[in-house]
């Protein structure tokens, strides 16, 4: 669900859409309710979903209205505008460092860690390019967002889907676009509250090797986000009902975003985003087999620098 918010993008290149489409509030609300049940471990379909969906009508309706506004802002002003609309509605103030390191043109990948919540909204609000695309997990939610959905690169754990997504991402880069990619695609610990060990980076797939092999002129910008998932939600008793660590973080981030939408002034949220120096495959001696070790080394160095700056 949160990844849907992260997906605010503009059309490819500098093309401005001739008409902004209007999202259906009922379709968005239905999709949001599906995601509520999924976050709780109850499934997006079934008897419970059909019988108890009304219980979440108020927060789902409120979220739907906000998402419709974000979708409209993306259609009119591009990804940064859409991201900023949601951040404003959440009452979030972003602290940033190094945003001027993002290439103004040409193929580029913003490679980031993934603590969840609104990390990509915070990052997206700092990317001034209209050709931004985001790699996201497939879900019905996106289909209810007409100005966002056409500009996503959807993927899933299925090998066929992941390869198609990488091909689409490579095509976008070859056309000179910018891509926002989260290392593993899974929710990870927030560096502001939890240690980020080697095991986190060990889960990152070698997708950058594939992309840089196909588009070697791509510049990669390491980015670190922190301070997005607050301890009061991470440690909430309801979160303990989920066993898997990633499911716990998914539920915590969902609860936090819903709470902030309902009570935007009740939380002083100040995420921190930092960007490192861009690098290319030539920094690995032109050998794509050495790209992932270089990528991981750059991300670890950026994490250390980020923690020194943000504390």
How should each PLM-predicted stretch be described?
Residues 189-284:
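A cross-family acyltransferase "interaction/gating" segment
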Residues 18-108, 118-122, 129, 266:
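Membrane-anchoring hydrophobic helices of lipid-metabolizing enzymes
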Residues 133-136, 180-182, 219-224:
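A structural signal for short, well-ordered beta-strand segments and their strand-loop junctions
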Residues 175-189:
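A structural motif
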Residues 108-160:
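Catalytic core of membrane glycerolipid acyltransferases/transacylases, capturing the structured
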Residues 114-118, 186-188, 228:
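Gly/Ser/Thr-rich loops at beta-strand to alpha-helix junctions
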Residues 1-18:
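N-terminal amphipathic/basic-hydrophobic helices that include classical n-h-c signal peptides
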Residues 165-175:
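Short amphipathic alpha-helices and their capping/turn segments at secondary-structure boundaries
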């Amino acid at each position: 669900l949160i990844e849907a918010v992260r997906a605010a993008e503009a059309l490819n290149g500098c093309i401005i859409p001739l008409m902004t489409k209007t999202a259906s509030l009922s379709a968005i609300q239905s999709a949001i309710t599906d995601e509520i049940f999924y976050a709780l471990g109850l499934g997006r379909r079934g008897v419970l979903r059909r019988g108890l969906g009304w219980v979440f009508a108020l927060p789902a309706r409120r979220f739907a209205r906000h998402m419709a506004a974000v979708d409209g802002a993306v259609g009119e002003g591009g990804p940064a505008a859409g991201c900023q609309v949601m951040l404003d509605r959440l009452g979030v103030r972003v602290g940033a460092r190094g945003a001027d390191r993002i290439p103004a043109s040409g193929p580029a990948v913003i490679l980031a860690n993934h603590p969840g919540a609104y990390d990509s909204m915070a990052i997206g609000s700092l990317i001034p390019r209209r050709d931004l695309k985001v790699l996201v997990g497939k879900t019905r939610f996106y289909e209810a967002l007409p100005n966002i959905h056409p500009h996503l690169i959807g993927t899933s754990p299925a090998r066929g889907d992941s390869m198609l997504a990488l091909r689409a991402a490579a095509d976008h880069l070859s056309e000179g676009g910018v891509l926002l990619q989260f290392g593993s695609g899974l929710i990870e610990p927030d560096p502001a509250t939890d240690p980020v060990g080697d095991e986190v980076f060990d889960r990152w797939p070698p997708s950058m090797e594939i992309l840089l092999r196909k588009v070697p002129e791509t510049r990669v910008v390491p980015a670190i986000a922190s301070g997005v998932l607050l301890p009061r939600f991470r440690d909430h008793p309801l979160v303990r009902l989920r066993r898997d660590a990633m499911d716990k973080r998914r539920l915590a981030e969902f609860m936090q975003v819903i709470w902030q939408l309902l009570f935007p002034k009740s939380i002083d949220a100040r995420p921190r985003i930092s960007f490192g120096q861009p690098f290319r495959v030539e920094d690995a001696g032109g050998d794509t087999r050495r790209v992932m070790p270089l990528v991981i080394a750059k991300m670890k160095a950026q994490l250390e620098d980020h923690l020194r700056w943000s504390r």
